[in-house]
A protein has these predicted regions:
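N-terminal periplasmic "start-of-domain" segments of outer-membrane beta-barrel proteins
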Residues: 1-8, 37-38, 53
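Short beta-strands and strand-coil junctions in structured, solvent-facing domains, enriched
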Residues: 10, 26-29, 46-48, 62-64, ...
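Short acidic/polar hinge/loop motifs at secondary-structure boundaries
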Residues: 58-84
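A general structural signal for stabilizing positions within well-ordered secondary structure
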Residues: 10, 17-20, 69, 88, ...
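N-terminal periplasmic accessory domains that precede
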Residues: 16-19, 38-43, 56, 80, ...
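Extracytoplasmic beta-strand/coil segments of soluble accessory domains associated
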Residues: 17-60, 76
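Transmembrane beta-barrel wall of Gram-negative outer-membrane proteins
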Residues: 110, 117-148, 152, 156-172
Length: 172
């Protein structure tokens, strides 16, 4: 399965977990913790040990299962390869591979800001900028932050619990 920038925007895909809603035979469950996010392709995966589904971003392997739980911005394409991929990609690809490519700052320049809002005081911001300085040198910087107040109510304190805060960035 192959998704490009147009598909991702059209289908409102904002995270690795969102991919499983549109790619057949790919299942990335939400166990409630970012540390135990696992991926399954055609029913093959591992929740406890090393993952059976590989994740590569710009040809760099992400070997930990927690890598499957992040939001992204500036994605050029996502390719899901099903079946054993060990010959080309090595370990942790027994079930398949999720291969993500980001936009190259040499090919696309500009800046972008995305804001999101939702229930339970959810809000997020993502910003990116790409600049080309010479024909051979360009850079891209992006950052994101997201938080919510949680949707569980602690009856003792009368306050919401289960709040989440996450952020990240990338320099290319």
């Amino acid at each position: 399965s192959y998704l490009n920038t147009g598909n991702l925007d059209e289908m409102n895909i904002r995270s690795v977990k969102d991919i499983s809603t549109v790619v057949p035979n790919l299942f990335i469950p939400d166990y409630g913790s970012k540390l135990i996010s696992s991926a399954y392709i055609r029913g093959i995966g591992s929740r406890i040990n090393s993952p059976a589904v590989g994740l590569y971003v710009n040809n760099v392997p992400y070997l930990d299962k927690s890598a499957f739980d992040f939001d992204f911005i500036d994605i050029a394409s996502i390719e899901v390869l099903k079946g054993p991929q060990g010959t080309l990609y090595g370990r942790n690809t027994m079930a398949g591979l999720v291969n993500i490519k980001t936009l190259s700052p040499l090919e696309k320049q500009g800046s972008k800001i995305k804001l999101s809002f939702g229930n339970y005081n959810l809000w997020g911001v993502a910003a990116t900028t790409s600049q080309k300085l010479t024909d051979d040198f360009a850079f891209s910087i992006n950052a994101r932050y997201r938080q919510d107040d949680g949707y569980f109510k602690n009856e003792y304190t009368r306050q919401n619990s289960g709040s989440t805060r996450s952020g990240g960035g990338r320099v290319q």
